[in-house]
């Protein structure tokens, strides 16, 4: 029988983009959570993903990319608990934390992100480093600064893989860098954006391997179609998102990949007292992207208030297309919107302005 269960009327798990925007929304609205409400996050600060490439390229300092959580939580009546969620039992309304705490909640909001996908077999003969979660990646990157790796393989031909590749070139000018894409580079974006990205990678002396999905890792080597193609010192996973293991066994209605299925009000389809947003959630026409998570934040903030008050919930409507800005490590950026694509310093200035404005709003 469990003892020392802590009761909380509202619990927010994870300081992702949607939760940060929700908290700022509450500050503006003058809303304070009921006594005993909690924010659970592994660290006392949240990393802003949009500025990570700039940090790696030396354009920003770590503190510029972090949102301190204590003051923001205190402003809306939340107690910050620095721990990691280990288990959720949705039916009983219980959370088990890594530090041994058990919390019983009335309303729960999950914005805990995701982990890097590993879509192949490996024998652990190479170090695998996920681009997410950010704290682990940043810690390893900082340790590499004093002893740069001989060769790195970056897996993932999306925006994250591209941005990491060109940023890591600045950090490690003498390291061999290889970027592997299972499809064409930046598939899903306009073809012109991919052409611009290829030119940037060539200029940065990053070797690009398109349409080469990794089959596995054995004896320190990467395999494509059962043939060894590379023997790097480490592998960085920018291969998209995977659900944390606990989501598959928590009792919530999840999709085939373990992401929590939600309705347009951002509620779990199976448990209406549980909300989910950002990378941990599954909603039609809503990619796992910070742009969409930020837009969810205002609706989520209003709906958590409404859930507690018993009033009507608002509906989140994903935008049909989103502006994409890919940092190029030198202050410029690639830009696409719909079928349009361009590049240059002006796009980089726009990205910096948007990122720094977001950080000013959060601090």
Annotate each language-model stretch with its function.
Residues 330-363:
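C-terminal auxiliary extensions adjacent to catalytic cores
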Residues 280-329:
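A conserved FAD-binding loop/helix module that cradles the flavin
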Residues 2-78, 152, 163-191:
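Beta1-alpha1 glycine-rich phosphate/pyrophosphate-binding loop at the start
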Residues 2-11, 75-151, 236:
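FAD-binding core/adjacent interface of flavoenzyme oxidoreductases
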Residues 80-87, 103, 173-264:
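A Rossmann-like FAD-binding core segment of flavoenzymes
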Residues 126-148, 229-234, 238-295, 302:
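FAD-site-proximal beta/loop scaffold in flavoenzymes
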Residues 18, 113-116, 241-243, 331:
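Short glycine-rich anion-binding loops that position phosphate/pyrophosphate groups of nucleotides
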Residues 37-39, 108, 177, 235, ...:
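Hydrophobic/aromatic residues located in beta-strands of well-ordered beta-sheets
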């Amino acid at each position: 029988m469990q003892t020392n269960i802590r009761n909380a009327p509202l619990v927010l798990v994870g300081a992702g983009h949607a939760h940060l925007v929700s908290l700022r929304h509450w500050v503006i609205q003058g809303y304070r959570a009921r006594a005993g409400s909690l924010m659970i996050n592994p660290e006392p600060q949240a990393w802003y993903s949009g500025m990570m490439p700039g940090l790696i390229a030396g354009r920003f300092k770590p503190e510029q990319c972090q949102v301190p959580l204590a003051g923001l939580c205190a402003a809306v009546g939340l107690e910050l608990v620095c721990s990691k969620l280990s288990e959720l039992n949705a039916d009983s309304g219980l959370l088990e934390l890594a530090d041994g705490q058990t919390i019983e909640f009335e309303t729960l909001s999950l914005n805990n992100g995701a982990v890097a996908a590993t879509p192949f077999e490996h024998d652990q003969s190479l170090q695998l480093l996920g681009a997410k979660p950010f704290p682990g990646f940043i810690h390893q990157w900082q340790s590499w600064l004093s002893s740069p790796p001989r060769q790195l393989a970056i897996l993932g031909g999306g925006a994250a893989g591209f941005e990491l590749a060109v940023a890591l070139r600045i950090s490690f000018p003498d390291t061999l860098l290889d970027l592997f894409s299972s499809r064409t580079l930046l598939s899903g974006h306009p073809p012109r954006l991919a052409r611009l990205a290829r030119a940037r990678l060539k200029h940065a002396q990053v070797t690009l391997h398109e349409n080469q999905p990794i089959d596995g890792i054995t004896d320190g080597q990467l395999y494509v179609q059962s043939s060894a193609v590379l023997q790097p010192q480490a592998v960085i996973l920018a291969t998209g998102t995977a659900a944390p293991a606990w989501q598959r066994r928590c009792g919530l209605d999840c999709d085939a990949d373990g992401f929590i299925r939600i309705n347009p009000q951002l509620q779990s389809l199976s448990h209406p007292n549980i909300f989910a947003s950002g990378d941990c959630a599954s909603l039609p026409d809503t990619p796992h992207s910070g742009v969409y998570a930020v837009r969810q934040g205002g609706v989520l903030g209003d709906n958590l208030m409404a859930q507690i008050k018993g009033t009507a919930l608002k509906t989140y409507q994903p935008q049909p297309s989103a502006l994409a800005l890919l940092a190029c490590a030198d202050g410029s950026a690639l830009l696409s919107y719909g079928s349009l694509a361009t590049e240059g310093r002006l796009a980089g200035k726009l990205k910096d302005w948007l990122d720094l404005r977001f950080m000013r709003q959060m601090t």
